[in-house]
Design a protein with these regions (language model features):
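Short, surface-exposed, polar/charged, turn-prone segments marking secondary-structure boundaries
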Residues: 144-148, 210-211, 277-280
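Conserved hydrophobic/aromatic pocket- or pore-lining residues that grip, position, or stack substrates
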Residues: 121, 220, 267
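Residues within well-ordered alpha helices
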Residues: 18, 171, 238-239, 266
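Terminal accessory/targeting
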Residues: 1-199, 283-289
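C-terminal active-site subregion of NodB/CE4 polysaccharide deacetylases
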Residues: 239-243, 258-289
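Short secondary-structure junctions
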Residues: 25-29, 247, 274
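Metal-dependent polysaccharide deacetylase catalytic core of the NodB/CE4 family, i.e.
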Residues: 124, 128, 149-150, 166, ...
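Conserved residues at the C-terminal ends of beta-strands
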Residues: 3-4, 253, 278-280
């Protein structure tokens, strides 16, 4: 417990981050066992200027919002990473957490090597199935007119070239030290950037349910979900219903900006606890580390 008479939302968020990093309960308050700490006051009113070193860990947490305010945006409103001051080879958040933990006697492995997590976005679960009868008929006619008999044969006899469940099952057996995290896109309405499968298709639901029996599956919200009232709720609801468990992780469509605090608050209200979509528009990596 870090001593503070009136901890606010910023203190709560930092406490949650430290708890996850250290593996122990961290909070701010005035209990008898509370420890003193160097309080620069930055957490009272977080701004866009980097705070003193003592609050550097909190700064990493807030940097997503800082860059949201300052970085140049692309045509979809996503921050451009080429102007961000960062080094993708340095795990800043981890180093700050270790350094701060040492100061308060919390033991952390200095050379811990986490197991790799491979993130798989399923934008198109199937090439042919699960897209509605109009798409199926129209696609078949197109393939016949083009003379694409291989595609016609795949439509009739399979296997579907996009359905990769068997591949990932073999991957998991070959690399048991790794973890797979899937994010499935179930767009309620088709659009320019949403041309995937239908969430009400029995074939789609069965395939996702089977995938969820072995791997972690989260929601991959569609481009159009940002523009429809209740769009997040509807698509996350489909994933909840199919898997039979609450959806705790989500990842925004790559073309949508993921740094909006109102968006994250909306997801929190829907029960989502982890956002995996902090990409820049033009460079690899995450904004906060």
């Amino acid at each position: 417990v870090f001593r503070h008479a009136r901890p606010g939302i910023a203190h709560q968020r930092v406490a949650q981050l430290l708890s996850a990093a250290w593996g122990v309960s961290v909070s701010f308050g005035v209990s008898p066992e509370a420890q003193s700490w160097v309080d620069s006051g930055w957490l009272e009113a977080p701004g866009t200027h980097e705070p003193r070193f003592e609050d550097a860990f909190a700064w990493i947490l807030w940097r997503t919002e800082y860059w949201e305010l300052t970085l140049e945006k692309d045509g979809h409103g996503r921050p451009m990473g080429r102007s961000a001051m960062r080094d993708v080879m340095i795990p800043e958040a981890e180093l700050r957490a270790i350094e701060l933990a040492e100061a308060y006697g919390v033991s952390l492995p200095l050379k811990g090597k986490p197991s790799p997590t491979v993130v798989v976005d399923i934008d198109h679960l199937f090439a042919y199935r699960g897209r509605g009868w109009r798409s199926a008929v129209g696609g078949a006619v197109r393939d016949v007119l083009r003379g694409d008999w291989r595609a016609v044969a795949e439509r009739v006899n399979g296997p579907d070239p996009f359905y990769s469940s068997a591949y990932w099952a073999k991957w998991a057996s070959r690399f048991p030290q790794g973890t797979l995290q899937f994010f499935v896109l179930l767009a309620v309405e088709q659009g320019t950037y949403d041309r995937g499968v239908r969430p009400d298709s029995e074939a789609v639901r069965a395939a996702i349910k089977q995938l969820g029996m072995r791997f972690e599956v989260g929601a991959h919200l569609s481009y159009g979900s940002h523009d429809r009232s209740g769009g997040f709720r509807t698509e996350i609801g489909y994933v909840d219903q199919i898997l039979g468990v609450p959806t705790l992780r989500q990842r925004f469509h790559f073309l949508r900006n993921a740094g909006s605090l109102p968006q994250l608050q909306s997801l929190t209200e829907l029960g989502v606890r982890e956002d995996w979509s902090d990409e820049f528009a033009d460079t690899p990596g995450f904004r906060s580390g």
